[in-house]
Amino acid sequence: MIEGRVQRVGFRASCNRRALDLGISGWVRNLSDGRVEVQAEGPPLALSELRAWCEVGPPGARVVRVTPSQLPITGDDWFEVRY
């Protein structure tokens, strides 16, 4: 979960591009409470790089907190923006 000023700043689209560049699969979506949720799978180094990116976000974002969680692996081979 990503908290702060993370909606209406292009966070999902930017996260999608970054994840694809890193070869990560999963998804990103806005939540109704103003947070952004990301589920990502991939090599540990790529996941660390995506997390570091999420801690800053795109220009205009003001990330306050990134809270990771461990989820079951799905084996998907794409990354998408969910609505």
UniProtKB/Swiss-Prot annotation:
InterPro entries per the UniProt record, alphabetical: Acylphosphatase, Acylphosphatase-like_dom, Acylphosphatase-like_dom_sf, Acylphosphatase_CS
NCBIfam families: PRK14452.1
Gene assigned in the entry: acyP
Protein name: Acylphosphatase
Residue ranges of domain Acylphosphatase-like in the record: 1-83
EC number: 3.6.1.7
SUPFAM superfamilies: Acylphosphatase/BLUF domain-like (SSF54975)
Catalytic activity: an acyl phosphate + H2O = a carboxylate + phosphate + H(+)
Family (UniProt): Belongs to the acylphosphatase family.
Source lineage: Bacteria, Bacillati, Cyanobacteriota, Cyanophyceae, Synechococcales
Residue numbers annotated as active site: R12, N30
Keyword Hydrolase: yes
Gene Ontology terms, MF aspect: acylphosphatase activity
Species of provenance: Synechococcus sp. (strain CC9605)
Keywords in alphabetical order: Hydrolase
Domain of life (superkingdom): Bacteria
Pfam families for this protein: Acylphosphatase
